Amino acid sequence: MLRIENLDKRYKTGDRALKDVSLSIGAGDIVGLIGPSGAGKSTLIRCVNRLVQPTGGSIRLGDTELTRLGGTELRKARRRMGMIFQEFALIERLTVMENVLSGRLGYVGFWASWFRRFPQADVQRAFALLARVGLSEQVDKRADALSGGQRQRVGIARALAQDPELLLIDEPTASLDPKTSRQVMRLITELCAERGLAAIVNIHDVALAQLFLPRIVGLRAGEVVYDGPASGLTPDVLTRIYGEEDWSKTSDEDADSVDAPPRAADLPASLKLDPALARL
C-alpha cells in the first residue's frame, strides 16, 4: 500500500532530518510514530504527501512513485491521502459544513470551488460524515465557535471527505485534554477499521499510542530505532527512542517527588516554626 525506502531529508543548513528511513504499511494498517522533539516525525509525514521535498529515497503509494510527481499528477496523488493536522487547519469564518466540503475541492472545477457549489452527492456525504463524528447539530456553526475536540472532529470529517486510501495524522491530540484525546483516538481507529484505511499517526503521548495503536515506529535523530508491536515498548526500547529515563516510575510518583511539600521534620532549624507560635 505505502512503501518507503531509504528516505532522506537534508535541509540547506546541512541538518539531516531523516536518515535512510524504510518502512512498509499495508491496507488497513494503523502505525504510530513516536520519538523526542526533532526526531523527524512530522517531517516524515510531510515527505509522504510532498509538503516537504525529500532529498533522496523512494515513497510509493500503490504503484505511484510520489517523489517524482509534480503539478497535476501530484495534486491527483494528494487526493488519495487525507491529512489531519495538530492545529486543525480549519477556515475559521466558514461553517462546519463548508469546512468538510473543502475536502472535495480537488474533485470539482475552479468556479464550483470558488462559489462553494458542490454536487449533491458530496453534500449528502458530508452530512453522513458529520453524523458519524458526532457533529450533526453543529452543521451551520462557524468553525471558530467550536471547542478543540469538535474542531478536530471537523478535521477528521474533512479528511474522510476526500475518500482517501491513507490518512496522515500529525499530533491529533496535542491541543486536547486527556478525555477528549482518548475520544478522538478512539474515533480515528474506529473509522480506519470501518473503511479499511491505512494511517500514520504522529503522536507524542506514548501511553495513548500504546492504548490505541497496534504498531509503533520509534524515531530518534531521524532514524528508525524501533518498529514493532505496542506491547514491545519495554523500558529498554523507550530508552533507545528517548534516551535515559527511569521508565519504571509512574507519573504520580514523579509528581510526588516534584510537587510534594517538605515535611516539618526535614526543614532546617532556622525555618522550623516555634511550637508556641503554632498554637496561635
Curated annotation (Swiss-Prot):
**SUPFAM superfamilies per record:** P-loop containing nucleoside triphosphate hydrolases
Q: Which residues form the signal peptide?
A: none
Fetch the Pfam families from UniProt: ABC_tran
Q: How does it sit in the membrane?
A: Peripheral membrane protein
Q: Specify the enzyme's EC class, one word.
A: translocase
- One Gene Ontology cellular component annotation held by this UniProt entry: plasma membrane
Where are the annotated segments for Disordered? 247-266
What range(s) does the ABC transporter domain occupy?
2-246
- Where ATP binds, per the record, is at G35, P36, S37, G38, A39, G40, K41, S42
Concerning Gene3D superfamilies, the annotation shows: P-loop containing nucleotide triphosphate hydrolases (3.40.50.300)
GO MF entries: ABC-type phosphonate transporter activity; ATP binding; ATP hydrolysis activity
Print the keywords alphabetically.
ATP-binding, Cell inner membrane, Cell membrane, Membrane, Nucleotide-binding, Phosphonate transport, Translocase, Transport
Q: What function does the entry list?
A: Part of the ABC transporter complex PhnCDE involved in phosphonates import. Responsible for energy coupling to the transport system.
Q: How does it assemble?
A: The complex is composed of two ATP-binding proteins (PhnC), two transmembrane proteins (PhnE) and a solute-binding protein (PhnD).
The protein's matches in PANTHER family, at most eight in alphabetical order, are given as:
AMINO ACID IMPORT ATP-BINDING PROTEIN (PTHR43166), PHOSPHONATES IMPORT ATP-BINDING PROTEIN PHNC (PTHR43166:SF6)
**What's the protein name?**
Phosphonates import ATP-binding protein PhnC 1
Specify the species: Rhodopseudomonas palustris (strain HaA2)
The beginning of the lineage is: Bacteria, Pseudomonadati, Pseudomonadota, Alphaproteobacteria, Hyphomicrobiales
Gene that encodes it: phnC1
